[in-house]
Curated annotation (Swiss-Prot):
Its EC number is 3.1.3.-. The lineage of its organism: Eukaryota, Viridiplantae, Streptophyta, Embryophyta, Tracheophyta. The keyword Membrane applies. This is Lipid phosphate phosphatase 2. May play a general 'housekeeping role' in lipid metabolism. Exhibits both diacylglycerol pyrophosphate (DGPP) phosphatase and phosphatidate (PA) phosphatase activities with no preference for either substrate. May play a role downstream of the ABA signaling pathway during seed germination and in stomatal movement in leaves. Induction: Constitutively expressed. Not induced by stress, mastoparan or hypersensitive response elicitor harpin. Down-regulated by ABA. Keywords: Glycoprotein, Hydrolase, Membrane, Stress response, Transmembrane, Transmembrane helix. Expressed in roots, stems, leaves, buds, flowers and siliques. It is a multi-pass membrane protein. It comes from Arabidopsis thaliana (Mouse-ear cress).
């Protein structure tokens, strides 16, 4: 379907109507935020860590290359900025609303899944020894040889949240969604062989991958944690994107489903109006004959 500019369908003219139509979706987003907060507050499962298991958990405890506060900037703010730029170019409130809604769902659903698994699995991080024994002196149960941590409670708690990587899953959820969004907008799969378009689409995924690599380099995660986080984030991003947009390889992949539904409704209204006018003319002709 050819692209048609919708100059009248802006935030000011139709924003409230579109948002109200999806009010239940926004309420679900609020519920996901509450669930995410709860999952971060509760205590994760403290998996058994024997004395002989600490051989692989003695990596140094160090700061994050990418701090926690930077993850929302990478996963949410950056894609949000790109979506807003496209809105100012096209002035399509349907695209703006559905892209933002899809992005937020992608990140929040990923966050809930990630933290739920973290709390349930309780896998120790590679630097767990130094979290558990900051003075370097290990203390173990006489019978089971399980660790008896002397470190700060919050530090030890965080040490049981290795799998999967939250940095990685969030990054792939947000930037994966952005990659799909750009794929549709610049028509990467139009079969014209423009590899430059493909490079643009791969760039967000590369950034997400580098975030994952930094988690292994910082000894905050095992490689399996990063791989699992990437799979979760990218899978959720794909499902959330397809909920609002056609696949990027579709000829209509440049616009949201709501855009094409609006066009169909507009055509039906025009046809109904034309039919009513034709009927009115026929009635007038009949009356004049009489």
């Amino acid at each position: 379907m050819p692209e048609i500019h919708l100059g009248a369908h802006t935030i000011r003219s139709h924003g409230v109507t579109v948002a109200r139509f999806h009010m239940h979706d926004w309420l679900i987003l609020l519920l996901l935020i509450v669930i995410e907060i709860v999952l971060n507050v509760i205590e994760p499962f403290h998996r058994f860590v024997g004395e002989d298991m600490l051989t692989d958990l003695r990596y140094p405890l160090q700061d994050n290359t990418i701090p926690f506060w930077a993850v929302p900037l990478i996963a949410v703010v950056l894609p949000f900025a790109v979506i807003c730029v496209y809105y100012f170019i096209r002035n399509d409130v349907y695209d703006l609303h559905h892209a933002i809604l899809g992005l937020l769902f992608s990140v929040l659903i990923t966050g809930v899944i990630t933290d739920a698994i973290k709390d349930a699995v309780g896998r120790p991080r590679p630097d767990f020894f130094w979290r558990c024994f900051p003075d370097g002196i290990g203390i173990f149960h006489n019978v089971t040889k399980n660790v008896l941590c002397t470190g700060a409670k919050d530090v030890v708690k965080e040490g049981h949240k290795s799998f999967p990587s939250g940095h990685t899953s969030w990054s792939f959820a947000g930037l994966g969604f952005l990659s799909l969004y750009l794929s549709g907008k610049i028509r990467v799969f139009d079969q014209r062989g423009h590899v430059a378009k493909l490079c643009i689409v791969i760039l967000p995924l590369l950034v997400a991958a580098l975030v994952g690599v930094s988690r292994v380099d910082d000894y905050w995660h095992h490689w399996q944690d990063v791989f699992g986080g990437a799979i979760i984030g990218l899978t959720v991003a794909t499902f959330c994107y397809l909920q609002f947009f056609p696949p990027p390889y579709d000829p209509d992949g440049w616009g949201p489903h709501a855009y094409f539904q609006m066009l169909a409704d507009s055509r039906n209204d025009v046809q109904d109006s034309a039919g009513m006018n034709h009927l009115s003319v026929r009635q007038t002709e009949l009356e004049s004959v009489r």
